[in-house]
Amino acid sequence: GVAVGAGSALLPGTILRGHTSIGCGCTIGPNSYLENAKIGDDTNVNSSQVYNSTVGYDTHIGPFAYIRPGSTIGSHIRVGDFVEIKNSTIADGTKISHLTYVGDSDVGQNCNFGCGTVTVNYDRAKKYRTTIGDNAFIGCNTNLIAPVTVGDGSYIAAGSTITDDIPAMALAIARARQQNKKDWAAKHKIKEK
């Protein structure tokens, strides 16, 4: 059945199904769908979906986040707009604010995911896990090609595609170096008809 703790608000368009429990002081909705979900105290789930997963206390989900089965999201976490999490564990204090996919991953405490981060978990034959240590900083538009481990306190430069493990406290840069071709545009200008 469904259980809702004292002081929690269910806003319009919210649907709770299966064995779903909502802690005390939560705000769920508007337009949220939770099925077999366990939500901790003082957590907000705004216009998002949570399936067969657990969310800790004082965590903010959404808007427009999709928490797929098998996920455990800790406390004091931000899962923002257009973030999808599948079969992953996210430790306390981590921020995944927008436009990110975290699948088949184990994420440490106090990590920061830049916009457009993707854990690339499937090679057409098998799904692999990504492990991210505590206090890691992942720059925008990063691809993490699993299986891969990101060490504690490491940084990943924006635009990187990571294929090898990153040691703790290291900076990983995995992108092509920019080249500027002087006067290229002038030489290749489209002639008006």
Describe each model-derived feature in a short phrase.
Residues 2-173, 178-179:
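Structural signal for interior beta-strand "rungs" in well-ordered beta-sheet cores
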Residues 181-193:
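Short, charged, intrinsically disordered terminal tails
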